[in-house]
Structures are given as C-alpha cells and as structure tokens.
UniProtKB/Swiss-Prot annotation:
There is a cross-link at K248 (Glycyl lysine isopeptide (Lys-Gly) (interchain with G-Cter in ubiquitin)). Transmembrane segments: none annotated. GO terms for molecular function: structural constituent of ribosome. PROSITE patterns: RIBOSOMAL_S3AE (PS01191). The modification Phosphoserine is found at S245. Component of the small ribosomal subunit. Mature ribosomes consist of a small (40S) and a large (60S) subunit. The 40S subunit contains about 33 different proteins and 1 molecule of RNA (18S). The 60S subunit contains about 49 different proteins and 3 molecules of RNA (25S, 5.8S and 5S). GO terms for biological process: translation. It comes from Saccharomyces cerevisiae (strain JAY291). Keywords: Acetylation, Cytoplasm, Isopeptide bond, Phosphoprotein, Ribonucleoprotein, Ribosomal protein, Ubl conjugation. Belongs to the eukaryotic ribosomal protein eS1 family. It holds the Pfam family Ribosomal_S3Ae. Its main location: cytoplasm. This is Small ribosomal subunit protein eS1B. The modification Phosphothreonine is found at T254.
C-alpha cells in the first residue's frame, strides 16, 4: 500500500458552512450635530469601525462630509430644493461636531427655472470671509417682463447682462468679506442677499428667481477648537467664571 495523503480523509464534512460574523458587531454609531445656526441640530447617525490597536475611530471620522437637505435642518419644506454639506471637525464622546462645508441646489430645481422667452444670467466670485475661509459663490438670475410690456419675450441685451453681472459680483464680494462663515450661513438661509440683488438691479433690468445656487469651500484656516465650540453653543461667555467640577483643590505646603 502506497504511503501518502488520503484526499478523502482530509476533506471536511459536506454541508458544514463557515461561521458568518456580522460586520456590524465591529462598528459603532455616532450622532452628527449641526452648528447652532440651523434650527434642527440633530442631523442623523453614522457608523465607523471601532477603535482597535493603533487605529482610532475618531481619526476615521474627522473630515467626513455629509450632505443634508436644508428642509430637514430648518424644519420647513420651503428649503427642500437646497442641499447643505457639513464637515466633521471634532469628535466629542458619541457626538460629531460639524461645520459648514458648502451648499448646492437640487438638479430638478435648476431645470425647472430654465424657461423660454427669458435670459439666464450667471455670476461667480472667489472671496475670503472675515475669519479667513476662502469661498467660491455662484449666483443665478432670470429676466422678467417689464411693467405694461406687450412683447412676449424678456431678453436682455449684452450690455444689460454685463452690468447686472457686475452688480451681483460686487454685492456678493461685499457681503462675504464683511461676514464670518457663520454669519454668511445665516444670510444664505433666508435669502437676504437675493433681495438686495433684486433691488440693486431693478433700474437696469427687472429680474426674477434670483438665488445663490452654490457655495463651494476652497480653503479653510487652521483648525480652532474654541471657535468650533462657540459655533455649537458650547464654551460661550455665559460659562465664564464658573468653577470647573471634577478637579480637587491642591493644597500646597507652607514653606
């Protein structure tokens, strides 16, 4: 009898399956918190692999960008066509503190505004806020009929388009330079800038559907934990002067 490996004996029994491990047992959930500039601060939840060895869960979470509908953050369906991007900057226990990272329109809203018999005017500026955030802001506007107009269309001449684009760029630059990122976010939500553009351009050509359709973050300053805590309503001036609990007073021996 030849001495060798018996292939039949080395095989496992038929029907046995490998033990399936649920991948979610190695993950943990974190709550995403929006800045205090929004009405609803509870954005949702996200998961990440648990900390093991040299791999820390907080390192995998920092820098993560989530996209949320502005209607969910404000509790109003009037903002359902705008999407807000929030970036995770700090991990505090099971809470993820985020900051504004950008804004955009939904595709269906942009497509619905483009119609016949009117002129589309677009403008964009790259400008720095007062707290050193570099943003690129895109604005969009459409012409409308003048009062008592008989013509069917409301096309604007090239000179009108250039003049309107110049006014829009000047207003956007001024508003961004004189505001912090949090203040600018507060202006974008109620569309304060849009009304200012409409009033400034009514003598050139009447406009409608004026929107800041996109805000893109190009560069951000060095991370400041104190500024982020203030943005989330923590570490404010009301708490100044309070005694910090959890520490014992150290008694020094007299010399």
């Amino acid at each position: 009898m030849a001495v060798g490996k018996n292939k039949r004996l080395s095989r496992g029994k038929k029907g046995l399956k490998k033990k399936v491990v649920d991948p979610f047992t190695r993950k943990e959930w974190f709550d995403i918190k929006a800045p205090s500039t929004f009405e609803n601060r509870n954005v949702g939840k996200t998961l990440v692999n648990k900390s093991t060895g040299l791999k820390n869960a907080s390192d995998a979470l920092k820098g993560r960008v989530v996209e949320v509908c502005l209607a969910d953050l404000q509790g109003s369906e009037d903002h359902s066509f705008r999407k807000v991007k929030l970036r995770v900057d700090e991990v505090q226990g099971k809470n993820l503190l985020t900051n504004f990272h950008g804004m955009d329109f939904t595709t269906d809203k942009l497509r619905s505004m483009v119609r016949k018999w009117q002129t589309l005017i677009e403008a964009n500026v790259t400008v720095k806020t007062s707290d050193d955030y570099v943003l690129r802001i895109f604005a969009i506007a459409f012409t409308r009929k003048q009062a008592n107009q008989v013509k069917r269309h409301s096309y604007a001449q090239s000179s009108h388009i250039r003049a309107i684009r110049k006014v829009i760029s000047e207003i956007l630059t001024r508003e961004v330079q004189n505001s912090t990122l949090a203040q600018l976010t507060s202006k974008l939500i109620p569309e304060v800038i849009n009304k200012e553009i409409e009033n400034a351009t009514k003598d050139i050509f009447p406009l409608q559907n004026i929107h800041v359709r996109k805000v893109k973050l190009l560069k951000q300053p060095k991370f400041d934990v104190g500024a982020l805590m203030a943005l989330h309503g923590e570490g404010s001036g009301k708490e100044k002067g309070k005694k910090v609990s959890g520490f014992k007073d150290e008694v020094l021996e007299t010399v």
